Amino acid sequence: LEESPCPAVSDGLRRRMGEAAIKAAQAAGYTNAGTVEFLLDQKGRFYFIEMNARVQVEHPVTEMLTGIDIVREQIRIAAGEKLRHEQGRIWFHGHAIECRILAADGERGFRPSPGTITRWEVPSGPGVRIDTGVTAGSVVSSYYDPMIAKVICWDQTRDSCIERMEATLRGMRIE
């Protein structure tokens, strides 16, 4: 489960963390998509953990909040084009949550559950994004990551986003 913005982080703290992330990237001469991770202690102090110089699996949450297609932008940059977005003009709008859907058996320690998908019904609609590469008839192997989809929901508020995610997950039928 991924969620943004984090309800435990104030706007001021989020701004300071963002400024620290930008300074870290600039100090390293980094000019592409990346993720800076921090650890937050109980007193609200944050500490640098790592910077991931890649598009992470959770990137759709950021895309839903900003309206920016991060993968498209990274391809453009790799092709020699200039970045179209200034950091100071990127704003979060609303709230986003991502759930990973696994072909795994929760009653058996989340062991992979390989086989053929015989039923694939996934709701769609405004504020709902499904990232997947499977459909009914797809074979799920035990030799690969059991993640078969990501469900990402967006809405104006955290409560309404949670409601949208719950409705979407309740409407899914995968066998």
Regions found by a protein language model. Give the residues of each.
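ATP-dependent carboxylate activation and anion-phosphoryl transfer catalytic cores
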Residues: 1-175
